[in-house]
Amino acid sequence: MASKTENSEKQKALNSVLNQIEKSFGKGSIVRLGDSARMKVETISSGALTLDLALGGGLPRGRVIEIYGPESSGKTTLALHAIAEIQKTGGIAAFVDAEHALDPTYAAALGVDIENLLVSQPDTGEMALEIVDQLVRSVAVDIVVVDSVAALVPRAEIEGDMGDSHMGLQARLMSQALRKITGNIGKSGCTVIFLNQLRQKIGIVYGNPETTTGGNALKFYASVRLDIRRTQTLKKGSDEYGIRAKVKVAKNKVAPPFRIAEFDIIFGQGISTIGCLIDLAEETGVIKRKGAWYSYNNENIGQGRDRTITYMQENPAFTEEIDKRVRAALAGGAVVSATSVVKLDDNPDTDDHDVEDIDENTDEE
């Protein structure tokens, strides 16, 4: 066991080297973790209460996040909701539209302040990632969304001919860029969300043939990776009005991973926040369901899920009360199912809310 004299000498030596490091590299270059504000990771709401629960509070600030999935599964919708949540708190958001496909009307419908949203449509992948780096280093931007990694085309590929081979060029670009900007992201507290597409590996007989574009660097640098899939098509009669999305937290460095959340995405409106609230209210026992009827404090509020959603939309004070009770129940340790939600096809009121299953094996690029 070390004596008090030895401990005192060690402490002096430690203080000396810490002072030397701070003189060489600046104040804050090395800190005790217990004294650091980084111990508590701040979060941003994803716009879906079920997903916030699966993430352990929401999307982490000052981290790299990857959202990937098949086409039309809700990747851009989820990113736009995160932007809207940041803007509600007075934050500044930027959208790097490498796909040149951003719809301002849809973004506004989701609650995005398009008048103050910074948008860039870069010509090359190098230009896009340099813009991201400069926005992050400015410490003035709270969230940057890159849509998408697959559309970050290296300059050499654009300047070359159509049939030229550029093996691994995009992967090297992403690896170099992430090495450069990850440290700045942590210091600035800016959240950077990369949207990514899926591709199929050739010749894979066993295991999952799906992979994401841009190489492996993003998988390592990302603190959170979200796999989003379209599981059902929502219908009223023969009219399709939305989809059911399932998100698996494939990686999470700030909370337990592999949790699953489901929510509705309504065409032209985005994530159904009230739908998420009803699902969790039923799971926590705040709202009861008997057959097709939903009730609160032994009073029926709606027959079928859709009518209950309509009732809550028309009564914001009631919705706020339910929201407070659900959050209090969750904070008190209420247990919910693995998916955090009720399966829509378990709803006996099938005339009110029809669904059509989606075969995920058909979702290919």
UniProtKB/Swiss-Prot annotation:
SUPFAM superfamilies reported in the protein's UniProt record: P-loop containing nucleoside triphosphate hydrolases (SSF52540), RecA protein, C-terminal domain (SSF54752)
Any GO molecular function: ATP-dependent DNA damage sensor activity
Keyword annotations: ATP-binding, Cytoplasm, DNA damage, DNA recombination, DNA repair, DNA-binding, Nucleotide-binding, SOS response
Compartments in which it is found: Cytoplasm
Gene3D superfamilies named in the record: P-loop containing nucleotide triphosphate hydrolases
Entry keyword Transcription: no
Residue ranges with Acidic residues bias: 347-365
Region feature Disordered, mapped onto this chain: 344-365
InterPro entries cross-referenced by the UniProt entry: AAA+_ATPase, DNA_recomb/repair_RecA, DNA_recomb/repair_RecA_CS, P-loop_NTPase, RecA-like_C, RecA-like_N, RecA_ATP-bd, RecA_C_sf
Residues given in the record as ATP binding sites: 69-76
GO cellular component, as recorded: cytosol
Coiled coil: none
Biological-process GO terms, alphabetical: DNA recombination; DNA repair; SOS response
One Pfam family it belongs to: RecA_C
Family: Belongs to the RecA family.
Function description: Can catalyze the hydrolysis of ATP in the presence of single-stranded DNA, the ATP-dependent uptake of single-stranded DNA by duplex DNA, and the ATP-dependent hybridization of homologous single-stranded DNAs. It interacts with LexA causing its activation and leading to its autocatalytic cleavage.
Protein name: Protein RecA
Record organism: Arthrospira platensis (Spirulina platensis)
